[in-house]
Amino acid sequence: NRMGDKPDPDAVLSMTVCDPAMGSGAFLVEATRQLSDKLLEAWAAYPDKDPCKKLGADDRVFVAMRMVAQRCIYGVDRTPAAVDLAKMSMWLLTISKDHPFTFMDHSMKHGDALVGMSKEQIRKFHWDLSKGGSILPELRTLDREVEEAVQARLMLRNLDADRTLELEVTLAEADRKMMKAKQAGDLLVYIWFSQDRPKARNETRDRYTDKFTEALQPGSIERKEINEIRFAPKPLAPFHWDLEFPEVFACGGFTAFVGNPPFAGKNNVSKGNIRNYLDYLTSLVTPEASGRADLVGHFFYKAYGLIKPTGSLSLIATKTVRQGDTRESSLSLIVKKGGVIYDAKRRVAWPGKAAVVISVISITKLSLISLDIITSLIV
């Protein structure tokens, strides 16, 4: 328990937990329950920081859950219907019938957790930071815009869910600050996927530096195609983590990742996604990965890169995550970067009727145990 035996309420509410493929939000619902229990304990230990002293026990529970949901819980999914379902799950959990269904809009978002550009890639308008040239004039104010968005989104965390109009206005302002940068990131991803070879991608990118502003106009062909393909059967739905949740990365990253990311072998990844998707994963998400690695391995590697130096992740995977190409392309790479596998359940029967054997792997950036133990866990 990194918060200590008696964390104060501020410590509990400073935690950020994310599911990168949240589906219906089941893992985030459970995370909300557990963190709200911790928050109630913290209020009991620090009564001077308890905002609900006059409320009954049941009301205190629901206030705690709403505060945790609004401040600590984040989720992403590339299926729009799943995002709506997850929001509904949180809405029902917190008994927020008096609040709009959109009270989690700021932290539960549509997009592909594996596809997107960092702030630095967008600033240089290049996926390869070693090749990016001078910053485009249109992106020179990016740092200021991100900082302004951070401040607006921090206000969201502290606004009561009852203040519906103020929440909507503040979120709209934060989104407006990020709009140009997000559109630049979307365009960069669009350029990358539009070509099959590195040389053609670089040449196309160079052409767009001369017509950058034109390509971002609402009526441009590029904007139209980017918006259409975002919701296609095989979508390209970029998610630029630095820009979507800037307040999280202003604090170094997420406290934790949880979830059950999708499993898919090489052939299914290629068949089930837009052209060049597998190439993107092995070029930009996990550059040292084998093209034969299971999709779940890329989620492990991506999540590890998004947690703070004291953060951790615990994800469900198939047994392939500890075997062959998938292990070498995820767990082994994470360990080489200093990650510590502090718990590994190697063979767990999936509850219910499905004949599936899963692994549950928990990793932290903190140095807790020896490499000998790590090796024994992943073999």
For each predicted feature, which ranges?
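Signature of N6-adenine DNA methyltransferases within the class I
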Residues: 29, 36, 78-145, 158, ...
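Short, mixed-charge aromatic SLiMs
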Residues: 11, 53-58, 110-111, 115, ...
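Class I S-adenosyl-L-methionine
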Residues: 1-61, 82, 222-223, 227, ...
